[in-house]
UniProtKB/Swiss-Prot annotation:
Disulfide bonds join C58-C147. Pfam families: Sod_Cu. InterPro entries: SOD-like_Cu/Zn_dom_sf (IPR036423), SOD_Cu/Zn_/chaperone (IPR024134), SOD_Cu/Zn_BS (IPR018152), SOD_Cu_Zn_dom (IPR001424). It comes from Neurospora crassa (strain ATCC 24698 / 74-OR23-1A / CBS 708.71 / DSM 1257 / FGSC 987). This is Superoxide dismutase [Cu-Zn]. Keywords: Antioxidant, Copper, Cytoplasm, Disulfide bond, Metal-binding, Oxidoreductase, Zinc.
Length: 154
């Protein structure tokens, strides 16, 4: 079992943790998130970006992690970036908590996300269905108010 965590924060009120767990390279990865400080009753883009570099804030994390060179899509879509985790949904207080299981996100092997950055976006991810070029790259999810580098944990 490999475990990893990202402590998410930035130049906003958005903060929280994202925990990753994977049993083996062929097993799916469980992703558990607990994020606060978002707008209430909102959907916010949630992605793994390529770099673990946050020297200039979350913009230094680069584009979505996309080792297969595909277009952007929903977490459950057949064609998507590895880093496309869709949207998190907030409650009336702006908190988002949940767990998803993902077959593309890996902690083990050459496409590991360890050392990369999780980003919570300021807008809703259109899941690649926005009808423009940017939608196929970013889902038009907007600015990056909070992020955290994924690191190995106990």
């Amino acid at each position: 079992m490999v475990k990893a965590v990202a402590v998410v924060r930035g130049d906003s009120n958005v903060k929280g943790t994202v925990i990753f767990e994977q049993e083996s390279e062929s097993a799916p990865t469980t992703i558990t998130y607990d994020i606060s400080g978002n707008d209430p009753n909102a959907k916010r883009g949630f992605h793994i970006h390529t770099f673990g570099d946050n020297t200039n804030g979350c913009t230094s994390a680069g584009p979505h992690f996309n080792p297969h060179g595909t277009t952007h899509g929903d977490r459950t879509a057949e064609v998507r970036h590895v880093g496309d985790l869709g949207n998190i949904e907030t409650d009336a207080q702006g908190n988002a908590k949940g767990t998803v299981t993902d077959n593309l996100v890996k902690l083990i092997g050459p496409e590991s996300v360890i050392g990369r950055t999780v980003v919570v976006h300021a807008g809703t991810d259109d899941l690649g269905k926005g009808g423009n070029e940017e939608s196929l790259k970013t889902g038009n999810a907007g600015p990056r108010p909070a992020c955290g580098v994924i690191g190995i944990s106990q």
